[in-house]
Amino acid sequence: MWVWLHIDQFFCTCKGRLIMPVWLDAVPKKAAKVPRPDTLRWLLFLVFIILSGIALTLWGWTAERTGFVFWFTALGLPFCSWGLIFGLRRFAYKAEQVGAQSRNVERALLIEGEIQRGQRCAWILISSVQHITGNKTGVLIKAVENSSPATQVSAPRGCVSAVRYAALNAFQTDLDSEIISITSTLVAQVQKITELLPKDIPCCLMLDCDDDIRSRVEEHFRNELLAKTGRLFRLLAGKGLAAFDAWLDQHWEQPGILVAVTFSLPAQPDEGDADAITLLILSNRKAVAWPDTVCLHRPEKGQEAGLEKTLNRALLWAATDSVALKAGWHTGPAIASGSGWNMACENNGVVFSLSKDNRSIDPALGYAGRAAPWLAIILASAACNDNGPQVIAAQPSSNEEDVWVTVITKEEVRKESSGNV
């Protein structure tokens, strides 16, 4: 069991980088207290050994039954044998005791290190959203608060019949031109940020979009980035919050940024869905040029039925008490149809109103699919500036049960981080 500790440390470290996700549940349980040898049993065993020694000596002794040799054989030899066995057992007990204590110390250090790694976070330098309701977070938040539905009957590019959803209509009529236009707009925002950053800072790109437009979006976006910023952005293999989670581990050793871009433009949307395009630029160090940025903490993945533990773990990563949370934001059909999220909030002791401050963005803005977590994060980050820590629960895909929970706070510096961007 304890070999796991060393295997984990061996495989998790690659050129100084931790490459495995934080998973506290994989840490072995605390070693049980080693039971002390039962004194009464050993005394009874001593009596048995001595009686057996006397009986065997009397039965097999043919010489005169007197003298030192006789009595040592009858009494001393059994007693010495018992003492040797008891000494070995006592030594084994002490060895087990020391081993258990050392394993528990090692386990505690591992947990402490994993928690410290889990509490890595990123600062949101800038965010942007394209939605039919509007492009400003204030407008979107007001729409969510007023529950003003943005859905309307539209004809998606991949459907014969019309569907009631929150569509970006321009993308349905002239998709290629709109992709070029919005890409230029987003890259221009990235350029404004990179101009204020050191030239040698590592830059990563998380680009998530629908499969039918992926090749066009990736090629054009990467070319635009290189042409306008003059920087080489490393495209991450992962998508969504899973990519952000991995980025915190794989690119933590030195200051860097992550450009997270999501195009959610489904060709065949369901009723109540939404088109949305989001952009966030995240830094794994506090940025001097942006002193008032909020902090996105490591997300935790779970399922709707087990969100109590997921929320508890997300609070641990944020090093935040549940009573400090001021509001909640959630999106996704599994969360909307179930009671797991409300129960998780109650059981973790949140104090904000679950009817007023626990906001679902889907009734007003529609369900944005792969962009839904980032849309909720953008709204929560804007609210955090004015209202304090926010918690987000988001389901990235209606076809999967995974739900991500994360916390946004105003954070100055983390223990593991060093230096600024």
Name the predicted role of every residue range.
Residues 2-252, 269, 278-421:
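Conserved "HGTGT" condensation-loop signature of ketosynthase/thiolase-family condensing enzymes
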